Amino acid sequence: MYVILSSKPGQFRTELVEGLVAVEAYDYLFYGRRTAHFVIAELAHPVKVKVVEEFGEDVDATSRPAPTVNYVPSKFLEQFDTLQGARDELTRLATFGSMDITLVKRDVHARDWRATD
């Protein structure tokens, strides 16, 4: 089974946990600006996906509260039987009329998916 994990820089990020293996990674560009990052991951068994709250650059680092961490059961994520099924869904998510939306494939092993453009 495959799932799509999403992260929105400055808002939240999902992190891999044991039982999830990253297969492909994509940046979502909206009119040339990266607004999200997606990872297609293979799900070996039911897990709880780690979701970490992030803070934007507008929040002063010294007054920033500790991030909230949640664990979301994988049963709540849409699951795909094949890698191609997950790719097709990601493509569908990145298509909306004539808007300038692009998926850019990234190195799945890159550590800092939050880097600015």
Regions found by a protein language model. Give the residues of each.
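Short aromatic-glycine-(Arg/Gly/Cys) micro-motifs in beta-strand/loop hairpins
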Residues: 1-74, 92-95, 99-111
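A structural signal for short, well-ordered beta-strand elements
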Residues: 78-79
